[in-house]
Amino acid sequence: MEDNRKRNMERRRETSRHAARDRRSKESDIFDDLKMCVPIVEEGTVTHLDRIALLRVAATICRLRKTAGNVLENNLDNEITNEVWTEDTIAECLDGFVMIVDSDSSILYVTESVAMYLGLTQTDLTGRALRDFLHPSDYDEFDKQSKMLHKPRGEDTDTTGINMVLRMKTVISPRGRCLNLKSALYKSVSFLVHSKVSTGGHVSFMQGITIPAGQGTTNANASAMTKYTESPMGAFTTRHTCDMRITFVSDKFNYILKSELKTLMGTSFYELVHPADMMIVSKSMKELFAKGHIRTPYYRLIAANDTLAWIQTEATTITHTTKGQKGQYVICVHYVLGIQGAEESLVVCTDSMPAGMQVDIKKEVDDTRDYIGRQPEIVECVDFTPLIEPEDPFDTVIEPVVGGEEPVKQADMGARKNSYDDVLQWLFRDQPSSPPPARYRSADRFRTTEPSNFGSALASPDFMDSSSRTSRPKTSYGRRAQSQGSRTTGSSSTSASATLPHSANYSPLAEGISQCGLNSPPSIKSGQVVYGDARSMGRSCDPSDSSRRFSALSPSDTLNVSSTRGINPVIGSNDVFSTMPFADSIAIAERIDSSPTLTSGEPILCDDLQWEEPDLSCLAPFVDTYDMMQMDEGLPPELQALYDLPDFTPAVPQAPAARPVHIDRSPPAKRMHQSGPSDLDFMYTQHYQPFQQDETYWQGQQQQNEQQPSSYSPFPMLS
């Protein structure tokens, strides 16, 4: 008996196991069939699906067909087979995601793209309550706003909907880490909510727009928007304080609103908003400071020429800490839909033109009238022209004395100033309507009248070529002359009827150089020059005569200073080393009463005045850093040796300091005796011991000059 009972129990257990196995197999087949019927569980975002979630999704699909059946299009038999308008392509082009929520806040449907923005899949949201994924304070606002949209059947519903910002849970951190649903973060999502009446109640259609998940923090995304939204796609960036005063405006803002004539810095952003859209913008700004991020509905900004710009703004609040104090500002990215006239924006909405928008998108303001008749203008952006030109010791001009009166300083208002005194005089003048200094470099602005030679006048005080600085090409300065060979020209006498025009700018440097008596080298025979500028030499000096020479003035003549007033100095265009007569310095010293040694009543014998030759080694051609060229093997030995010196740095040339030989060393018969001691005599008495044998020295000096070779080198330190 006992054995039969055990045998029956084993048979029953085996039968029960087979029944349970068969039951589980049938349940699995049923769930497999149900899974095949539910469309959303076959998406790629579904990683794991339990049977409870499958039943929840299946029940939600059945509820969706019942509740939203009359508000959704069910007849898909006549669907156009064009792949461009399929459901998949439209969902991919959609910005954000779409949810369908029942009146009891149950999520009936959500698009697959929700996983990109919140990290939650369709199966995680479908069939569950929206309350579980919203911030508690935001759900109360959503419930209140959705009830305002619910209207009885037969009444006209609001086709535009309402905009609100709701904070939803996200399971992806800003750095891309996956989180648990219990430790999820809240993220601001801008929703556009529509409500429709269904058989089972009201159904809400919600479109959510936000930043994709795992793309960084809100501050980082706002900074990225500031940098990368300056594109020609109709978007521009502004930055505001907490009271919406503009602190930064992009260039696109001036292009769209045509506000380049009026600065917008410091003005309120509300001044640009159309009065009819002020309530929309103010409500969006309140939500911005409460939730940190918004996307406004479409509104209008007042533009120039009686036009309106349709704008949609995405704003973000940025919190920063500066010097221990927390601050906050707003970054707005404005997307421009188009520009239309003020009267056109008041047109009643129709089916062909929804929301009162213009038909022609991105219509620009016609600004052709602003550019008719204007010629192209080339603006120098690299070469900056200073306000005053650098003082060149080679281009000095002495103002002529006309009619025994002092010349009047009349600087050309359109010319560039040659000294800081002229600049200060121009800045503090009593004529505010006078034109400012010239903007571009032009030789015509500095040229007055072509200088003419005066045969019987005094010699030119210029040390180098006395032609106008602007008459020489700028590009040849500081570069080696390309032409080789002798550059000698004969002396020429000019007519005495020509007059020199007034110099517009009086140079104190020229006065100082003329007083110092900067002389011409007495040992020049040929015009061979190894300087950078290809300028011809002046008169050739006889090596046998080392005396001081004057152009157009014989050595045996005497010059009375009192009779030189009113005579114009000659500025020869071919003089390179033109002499600087002592008479010019006397005339200037008499005019300004600054000559310490000479008086105006003495005649001067100037054929045998001895002057010490200045050191011309400092007059090597100046080479700018940008004009440096590779030295070739064809350079003269002097230049090649000069550029081979170690630590050679080009520098701006300076005028050599000419020093006259002490007056006691000149021949006794031709000394200029003063009536009393002067400052110059005192200086040479303290620092210079004259030779005692003056007669013997001058006799030997004359013989030595006759025997010395007639070659001259501008670099005495290398010769």
From Swiss-Prot:
<dbReference type="GO" id="GO:0046983">
    <property type="term" value="F:protein dimerization activity"/>
</dbReference>
<dbReference type="GO" id="GO:0045944">
    <property type="term" value="P:positive regulation of transcription by RNA polymerase II"/>
</dbReference>
<keyword id="KW-0238">DNA-binding</keyword>
<feature type="region of interest" description="Disordered">
    <location>
        <begin position="1"/>
        <end position="24"/>
    </location>
</feature>
<comment type="subunit">
    <text>Binds to aha-1. Interacts (hydroxylated on Pro-621) with vhl-1; the interaction induces hif-1 degradation.</text>
</comment>
<dbReference type="GO" id="GO:0061629">
    <property type="term" value="F:RNA polymerase II-specific DNA-binding transcription factor binding"/>
</dbReference>
<feature type="domain" description="PAC">
    <location>
        <begin position="296"/>
        <end position="340"/>
    </location>
</feature>
<feature type="compositionally biased region" description="Polar residues">
    <location>
        <begin position="465"/>
        <end position="474"/>
    </location>
</feature>
<protein>
    <recommendedName>
        <fullName>Hypoxia-inducible factor 1</fullName>
    </recommendedName>
</protein>
<feature type="region of interest" description="Disordered">
    <location>
        <begin position="658"/>
        <end position="679"/>
    </location>
</feature>
<keyword id="KW-0678">Repressor</keyword>
<comment type="function">
    <text>A transcription factor which is a key regulator in various cellular processes; including environment stress resistance (oxygen levels, hydrogen sulfide and cyanide levels and heat), negative regulation of cell apoptosis in ASJ neurons by inhibition of cep-1 via transcriptional activation of tyr-2, resistance/susceptibility to pathogenic bacteria, lifespan and brood size. Involved in mediating susceptibility to enteropathogenic E.coli. Increased levels of hif-1 activity confer resistance to P.aeruginosa-mediated death but also confer susceptibility to S.aureus infection.</text>
</comment>
<keyword id="KW-0805">Transcription regulation</keyword>
<keyword id="KW-0902">Two-component regulatory system</keyword>
<keyword id="KW-0539">Nucleus</keyword>
<feature type="compositionally biased region" description="Low complexity">
    <location>
        <begin position="699"/>
        <end position="708"/>
    </location>
</feature>
<dbReference type="GO" id="GO:0006915">
    <property type="term" value="P:apoptotic process"/>
</dbReference>
<keyword id="KW-0677">Repeat</keyword>
<feature type="region of interest" description="Disordered">
    <location>
        <begin position="534"/>
        <end position="553"/>
    </location>
</feature>
<dbReference type="GO" id="GO:0048678">
    <property type="term" value="P:response to axon injury"/>
</dbReference>
<dbReference type="GO" id="GO:0010286">
    <property type="term" value="P:heat acclimation"/>
</dbReference>
<dbReference type="GO" id="GO:0003700">
    <property type="term" value="F:DNA-binding transcription factor activity"/>
</dbReference>
<dbReference type="GO" id="GO:0006357">
    <property type="term" value="P:regulation of transcription by RNA polymerase II"/>
</dbReference>
<dbReference type="InterPro" id="IPR011598">
    <property type="entry name" value="bHLH_dom"/>
</dbReference>
<feature type="region of interest" description="Disordered">
    <location>
        <begin position="428"/>
        <end position="503"/>
    </location>
</feature>
<dbReference type="InterPro" id="IPR035965">
    <property type="entry name" value="PAS-like_dom_sf"/>
</dbReference>
<dbReference type="GO" id="GO:0000981">
    <property type="term" value="F:DNA-binding transcription factor activity, RNA polymerase II-specific"/>
</dbReference>
<dbReference type="GO" id="GO:0000160">
    <property type="term" value="P:phosphorelay signal transduction system"/>
</dbReference>
<feature type="region of interest" description="Disordered">
    <location>
        <begin position="697"/>
        <end position="719"/>
    </location>
</feature>
<dbReference type="GO" id="GO:0001666">
    <property type="term" value="P:response to hypoxia"/>
</dbReference>
<keyword id="KW-0053">Apoptosis</keyword>
<dbReference type="InterPro" id="IPR013767">
    <property type="entry name" value="PAS_fold"/>
</dbReference>
<keyword id="KW-0379">Hydroxylation</keyword>
<keyword id="KW-0346">Stress response</keyword>
<feature type="modified residue" description="4-hydroxyproline; by egl-9">
    <location>
        <position position="621"/>
    </location>
</feature>
<feature type="domain" description="PAS 1">
    <location>
        <begin position="86"/>
        <end position="153"/>
    </location>
</feature>
<dbReference type="InterPro" id="IPR000014">
    <property type="entry name" value="PAS"/>
</dbReference>
<feature type="domain" description="bHLH">
    <location>
        <begin position="11"/>
        <end position="65"/>
    </location>
</feature>
<dbReference type="Pfam" id="PF00989">
    <property type="entry name" value="PAS"/>
</dbReference>
<dbReference type="GO" id="GO:0061433">
    <property type="term" value="P:cellular response to caloric restriction"/>
</dbReference>
<dbReference type="Pfam" id="PF23171">
    <property type="entry name" value="bHLH_HIF1A"/>
</dbReference>
<feature type="domain" description="PAS 2">
    <location>
        <begin position="222"/>
        <end position="292"/>
    </location>
</feature>
